[in-house]
From Swiss-Prot:
Keywords: Acetylation, Cell membrane, Cytoplasm, Cytoskeleton, GTP-binding, Lipoprotein, Membrane, Methylation, Nucleotide-binding, Prenylation. Pfam families: Ras. GTP binds at residues 26-33, 73-77, 131-134. GO terms for biological process: actin filament organization; small GTPase-mediated signal transduction. The keyword Cell membrane applies. Coiled coil: none annotated. The lineage of its organism: Eukaryota, Metazoa, Chordata, Craniata, Vertebrata. Residues 209-211 form a propeptide. A motif (Effector region) lies at residues 48-56. This is Rho-related GTP-binding protein RhoF. It comes from Mus musculus (Mouse).
Amino acid sequence: MDAPGAPAPAAAPSSARKELKIVIVGDGGCGKTSLLMVYCQGSFPEHYAPSVFEKYTASVTVGNKEVTLNLYDTAGQEDYDRLRPLSYQNTHLVLICYDVMNPTSYDNVLIKWFPEVTHFCRGIPTVLIGCKTDLRKDKEQLRKLRAAQLEPITYTQGLNACEQMRGALYLECSAKFRENVEDVFREAAKVALSALKKAQRQKKHRICLLL
């Protein structure tokens, strides 16, 4: 314990390791858990098991800085709509995921997920992720979609949804084939760090104005 009147500990240098909290949301079965497991554990789950709430930790290098990512997987099912907001506290960024082969999960980006995130995480940046891109070439999946008079969601449609929700970035990935998986989290970390710097500059500016 510091003695009375002792000087406060020096502030951590700017090169200190950063920690970011990132929450991942999206419809149940859209691919968000597989994305997290491949990135953090290197393994793709062959069988779908609904998540409730799980935390994963990983490290990423942004520029010359090591950043710790605390990644929170959430339940997309309606049964958890009242519990899920507990995950949003003190988050730095939200990844909104959808399945490019499931038009309903795409529609829910703007119908459900964006409004929910905006309500509970006002001012927090979002990144939109199109998952399961490998299935765009899967003949059986295409047959099922077309039998229902539906088509896979295109990259352009994903980009349009991102623009409508004023997302910071739109990315696509295939967890099964590890395509763009690392890019998703590296770019998400960049967006979150940039938002933090901007908030700190604004805070300093307000302090200067008050003085």
